[in-house]
Amino acid sequence: MTMKSGTQYEGKARKELQEWDIFSVGLQPDASPDLIIPKYNIGIEVKSTRLNKFYPSKNSEQYEYLKNKFSEDWPGYSAYYMIYFIKSHSWEVFPIASKSPFKVGKGISVYDFIQEIILTPEIVYISTENKNGGKK
């Protein structure tokens, strides 16, 4: 696994995002990709940027649909990631909660989430900071 971290890769990451047409998806509408998986054309994020033009607005029908679908598919969970799969042109939602089926504990990190859902070593790691201030 190749792991790249720190600000020296930030410019490169933004360029690659444009080239791959990967856009931000996730917990917050203003989030930017923190992990990029070229093989699957997926971007996962935990920090803010303007790369969110395809993220469903909180007032949109798409957002409401996904939120309701998540509640039905994952009852009892409150936090989730939204991921847009470019090749299939579809949104999917996955839970992050204390009862997470992907990891025992108080939730799931972005890195663990990707490992469990995608099961691939082809991860380009862009940022070392997460919402808890520690390293992933």
Model-derived regions, located:
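Domain-level recognition of nuclease-like catalytic cores that cleave nucleotide substrates
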Residues: 4, 78-136
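Acidic-residue sensor for enzyme active/binding pockets
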Residues: 10, 45, 62
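Acidic-basic catalytic patches of nuclease active cores, encompassing PD-(D/E)XK
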Residues: 1-27, 89
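Short, charged, amphipathic alpha-helix that recurs within catalytic cores of restriction-modification
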Residues: 54-82
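Conserved catalytic cores of phosphodiester-cleaving nucleases, focusing on short active-site segments
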Residues: 17, 35-37, 41-52
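Beta-rich catalytic cores
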Residues: 31
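A short local loop/turn or secondary-structure capping micro-motif enriched for an aromatic residue
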Residues: 51-54, 101-103
